[in-house]
């Protein structure tokens, strides 16, 4: 009755399962009894009948079982494939109407998916504004904020009325002190031809961008993005647009982007091209710990039913499908690992190419029956979706409830997630946005907040001077640990060699330091220092490539060259750039013809020279970088470098807070603090806060208690609350009685003691550790009495200061080695000393260098370094299959990697023990970011004097006799 009898069918299936035959007979009887129609269906799980074994393996992968498990889930018999019409007719020959009824059902189903239409939510403009008018109103306000220029909106034009400070105009070349001249009047500024010309550059660019945005129907898009970005800014959530969106003046004026596209020569057409009708794509980085707040705002503004995160599907690649199929077949880890490692290390390679390129894999496939079965199954499952998860950043916003447009599901936390991936969501014309999380923005915010607390200075990183010499000095010394995009060893070396003097230089280095263009770096450095005469294939390329010393680094340069030399529109030049990047031969031939003809027509350039330039553009387009993206990140890099140069304590504290959960990174940052003369004091229950923070008394950072392994933020907050409500803790009993016992449990208390955070409580660590049970028990008893409103039986005796510490409570302190081991485990660094301190005299007299100086040695030179093994990673070489060991050797300055393989592995493997002290003689490898040492000899550190002492000199004063 609900659906109408004509729309109600009884479903019949026949997969050779006996129970189905029983069910089908009953369904046929019901159909006769109640006058219902039947329809024959087929439960399809794989396309071909021969794929049943592969499907069985896939079920095992999903249920984490093995094929030989008789109790596992399975689809038996092998009948769940896509049958032909003839097969279905034969299966249901007793009820032929059930087969023909499938056509009736199909005709009743009507789903039309409209592609090519936009379904963006409509932004509701304030009263008295159209959407277009409101966007122009916001842009006029942005003109004043960014350029101190009063602009009036007149229809579709922006009219400049006042220029408060002409020096804020990016193309103004007049006096820097113009606004301070006694006769300067802002309302008369446009009468000055230089000021008028500089203002015109901005208004014409804005008119042009708005024309394209309106023509393509994206006004609501920019209002929506501008709205949630503005919400973020009002809430103090740092954000920055990445990618080609930074090339738009509109995004800059709406404060979506922080990059002035006029100053940095960025192109709008690289972002939004009227000749390539694609929706705009603005990727925005938010401070990673506040990103969820902005997503929640969009849910509240547009409705929870209209906003969802986008699903993503993990597929099985060549290596992973071999591992998965091998596991369900019951093969050993070693055997599966052997086969997987035969697949070349190429993320895009498939099994067919792997068999062509890997002789070992081909031989195993041809000669080993089990391997052939595994790979034949893997062929069927390769690229099949293995799992569904939530995209790290992508969000879709619809104009109506999303369940009307696409399939949805709930994630583990109850959030709404699409069952379509990113591209199909875009094909449906829905608004998809990337809300990305960037830790660096959290670091910048936290650093500025600390500067406000410690120095009373309100910092706005968007207003920092971009010509600060201290900042460039820091970069050029290679002191870039913690500096966004510039902190790798290779980047530090590049900064030192290049000598940065502007944000444009940082932009170039960020663009070059990638596979492909890295080969250009040595020549780029020589050109920077005037060691190479810069020549241009054509004089018209000089203004385009002058900024990058005659080398094309950016995609935008390719576009400008096509525009200036061959008369392309910038939109057409963007199509050329894309064609060059995709290397489509036929399209490239068409563009070459257009380019050569355009060069001749516009600039009378001969065909031979035009073809030469085209070849050059084609070469650079293959690896050219998006300048808008590079400039956006270069500014963030500069901001972090500025903060580190001027506020090192606050910056390093913010960095350490950011990496509290990463012991390896914390160790690097603590070492960096040491190099900068900043002391990192150990945790202290009376002094530390949740996070790392500047301490009183100069260049000092206090270790954050939440960074102690096993403690956690909840417990630390309870400690801080108790501390703020009273005085400092005086004893372990005092600590336990004042802090909520539900947070301060045994494991937390033991971690605090072993890390040294309770050293201020009057007893050594062994004694404190021994009192844990007593203190927690006494605290629990007192808390229970208080909750009942009772006074303790012992009254004042239960006050912490009155609890007597007996002689039996006073234990002998743990050995220094035990304390150091606990500190390293819980904090990531040593507090009470260093295990190598007893060997300091050996390191001083018998080491020829240390972990800090090895990077300065010539490549392939010999050296001798002593230290202690802090980590060992063992494995098998992908080339030879032989074992190797990667040893992290720690000395008093830091760590260095020791790669031991071949005969040296067998000779010295007995020395590979954690905390073992060694002297290593070997060859330096400085070819990669991090120096390595290939050892020729290893020996126990204590044997170094006997091995390397050649002479002993005795000096005996004469008066001894």
Would you name each region that the model predicts?
Residues 1-797, 873-876:
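Alpha-helical scaffold/interaction cores of sigma-54-like transcription cofactors
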Residues 417-421, 667-671, 762-959:
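Prokaryote-biased recognition of long, low-complexity C-terminal linker/tail segments
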């Amino acid at each position: 009755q609900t659906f109408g009898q004509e729309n109600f069918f009884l479903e019949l299936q026949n997969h050779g399962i006996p129970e189905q035959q029983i069910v089908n007979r009953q369904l046929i009887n019901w159909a006769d009894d109640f006058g219902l129609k039947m329809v024959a269906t087929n439960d399809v799980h794989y396309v071909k009948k021969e794929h049943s074994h592969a499907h069985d393996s896939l079920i095992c992968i999903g249920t984490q079982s093995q094929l030989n498990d008789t109790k596992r889930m399975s689809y038996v018999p092998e009948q769940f494939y896509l049958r032909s019409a003839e097969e279905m007719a034969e299966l249901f020959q007793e009820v032929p109407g059930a087969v023909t009824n499938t056509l009736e059902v199909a005709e009743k189903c009507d789903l039309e998916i409209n592609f090519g239409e936009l379904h963006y939510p409509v932004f509701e403009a304030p009263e008295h504004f159209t959407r277009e008018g409101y966007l122009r109103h916001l842009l006029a306000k942005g003109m004043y904020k960014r350029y101190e220029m009063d602009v009036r909106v007149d229809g579709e034009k922006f009219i400049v009325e006042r220029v408060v400070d002409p020096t804020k105009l990016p193309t103004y070349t007049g006096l820097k002190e113009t606004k301070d001249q006694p006769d300067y009047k802002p309302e008369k500024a446009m009468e000055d031809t230089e000021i008028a010309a500089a203002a015109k550059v901005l208004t014409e660019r804005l008119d042009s961008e708005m024309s394209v945005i309106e023509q393509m129907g994206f006004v609501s898009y920019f209002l929506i993005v501008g709205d949630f970005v503005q919400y973020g800014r009002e809430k103090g959530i740092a954000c920055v647009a990445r990618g080609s969106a930074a090339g738009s003046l509109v995004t800059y004026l709406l404060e979506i982007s922080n990059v002035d596209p006029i100053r940095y020569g960025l192109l709008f057409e690289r972002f939004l091209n009227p000749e390539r009708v694609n929706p705009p794509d603005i990727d925005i980085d938010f401070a990673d710990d506040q990103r969820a707040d902005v997503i929640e705002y969009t849910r509240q503004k547009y409705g929870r039913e209209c906003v969802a995160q986008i699903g993503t599907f993990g597929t099985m690649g060549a290596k992973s499908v071999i591992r998965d199929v091998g596991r369900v077949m019951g093969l050993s880890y070693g055997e599966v690992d052997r086969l997987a490692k035969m697949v070349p290390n190429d993320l895009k390679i498939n099994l067919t190419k792997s068999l062509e390129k890997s002789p070992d894999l081909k031989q195993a496939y041809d000669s080993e029956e089990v391997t052939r079965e595994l790979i034949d199954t893997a062929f069927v499952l390769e690229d099949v979706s293995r799992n569904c998860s939530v995209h790290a950043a992508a969000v879709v916003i619809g104009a109506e409830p999303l369940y009307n447009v696409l399939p949805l599901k709930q994630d583990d936390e109850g959030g709404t997630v699409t069952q379509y991936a990113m591209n199909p969501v875009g094909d449906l014309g829905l608004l998809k946005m990337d809300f990305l999380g960037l830790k660096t923005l959290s670091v910048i915010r936290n650093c500025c907040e600390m500067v406000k607390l410690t120095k009373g200075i309100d910092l706005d990183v968007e207003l920092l001077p971009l010509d600060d010499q201290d900042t460039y000095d820091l970069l050029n010394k290679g002191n870039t640990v913690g500096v966004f995009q510039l902190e790798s060893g290779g980047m530090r070396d590049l900064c030192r060699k290049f000598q940065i003097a502007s944000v444009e230089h940082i932009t170039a280095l960020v663009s070059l330091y990638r596979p492909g263009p890295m080969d250009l770096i040595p020549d780029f450095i020589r050109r920077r220092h005037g060691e190479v005469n810069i020549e241009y294939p054509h004089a018209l390329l000089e203004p385009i490539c002058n900024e990058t010393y005659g080398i094309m680094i950016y995609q935008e340069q390719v576009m400008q060259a096509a525009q200036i030399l061959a008369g392309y529109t910038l939109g057409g030049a963007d199509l050329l750039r894309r064609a060059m990047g995709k290397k489509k031969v036929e399209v490239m031939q068409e563009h070459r013809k257009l380019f050569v003809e355009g060069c001749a027509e516009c600039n009378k350039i001969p065909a031979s020279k035009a073809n030469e330039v085209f070849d050059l553009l084609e070469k650079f387009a293959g690896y050219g970088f998006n300048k808008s993206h590079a400039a956006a990140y270069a500014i963030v890099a500069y901001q972090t470098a500025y903060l580190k140069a001027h506020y090192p304590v606050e910056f390093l504290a913010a960095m350490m807070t950011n990496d509290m959960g990463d012991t390896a990174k914390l160790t690097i940052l603590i070492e960096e603090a040491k190099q900068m003369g900043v002391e990192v004091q150990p945790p202290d229950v009376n002094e530390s806060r949740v996070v790392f923070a500047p301490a009183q008394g100069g260049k000092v950072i206090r270790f954050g208690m939440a960074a102690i392994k096993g403690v956690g933020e909840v417990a630390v907050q309870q400690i801080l609350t108790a501390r703020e409500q009273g005085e400092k803790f005086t004893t372990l009993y005092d600590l336990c009685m004042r802090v909520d016992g539900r947070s301060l449990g045994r494991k937390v208390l033991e971690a605090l003691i072993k890390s040294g955070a309770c050293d201020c409580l009057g007893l050594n660590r062994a004694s404190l550790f021994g009192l844990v049970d007593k203190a927690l028990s006494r605290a629990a008893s007192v808390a229970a009495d208080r909750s009942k409103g009772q006074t303790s039986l012992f009254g004042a005796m239960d006050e912490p200061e009155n609890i007597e510490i007996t002689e039996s409570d006073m234990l002998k302190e743990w050995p220094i080695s035990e304390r150091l081991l606990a500190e390293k485990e819980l904090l990531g660094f040593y507090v009470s000393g260093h295990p190598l301190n007893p060997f300091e005299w050996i390191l001083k007299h018998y080491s020829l260098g240390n972990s800090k100086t090895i990077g300065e040695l010539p490549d392939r030179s010999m050296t001798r370094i002593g230290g202690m093994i802090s980590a060992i990673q063992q494995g098998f070489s992908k080339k030879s299959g032989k074992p190797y060991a990667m040893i992290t050797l720690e000395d008093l300055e830091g760590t260095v990697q020791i790669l031991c393989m071949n005969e040296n592995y067998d000779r010295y493997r007995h020395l590979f023990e954690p905390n073992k002290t060694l002297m290593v003689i070997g060859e330096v490898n400085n070819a990669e970011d991090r120096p390595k040492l290939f050892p020729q000899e290893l020996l126990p550190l204590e044997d170094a004097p006997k091995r390397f002492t050649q002479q002993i000199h005795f000096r005996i004063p004469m008066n001894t006799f």
